[in-house]
Amino acid sequence: DSVHTYTIIDNDDPPAIDFNTTSSTGAESVSSKAITVDLSEVSSKDITVDYTVTGTATGGGTDYTLANGTLTISAGDTTGTITIASIDDDSLDEADETVIITLSNPSNATVGSDSVHTYTITDNDSAPTIDFNATSSNGAESVSSKALTVDLSAASAQDVTVDYTVNGTATGG
């Protein structure tokens, strides 16, 4: 035979895929956030990895937009991004919220050590103020109790507590 074919078998380990950092933070006023996913080395193959989204923030366009999905990093590239979009800058005083993205089920790669990224959406709204509904009231001595109404200046997603003192010339009993 005048032709001989020699096949080189690729025995290199596939690259690892993971997040550039395991956490990041941004204010509600940031409209979107790109989270970087890295390969440990260049690959001659397209890489795909599934991701799931959990956390305390509400997805589906309420606090942000990002659903479970698949990221593709094209052959020759070493990074990709997953974008948390439409972060809602509401006017509600609330606790900071998290969006947790977890990588799994890669194709042509292995999952690296930093497979979970937590993005914290920090609330940028002031706590509401609290006031009495009226500045004074009165009642007969025979009244055994009196309910006083207080108002919040705005709705709050958190429980609101307030300390108060009682003073004056009347004596408690």
What are the functions of these language-model segments?
Residues 1-173:
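Short boundary segments that mark the start of a structured unit
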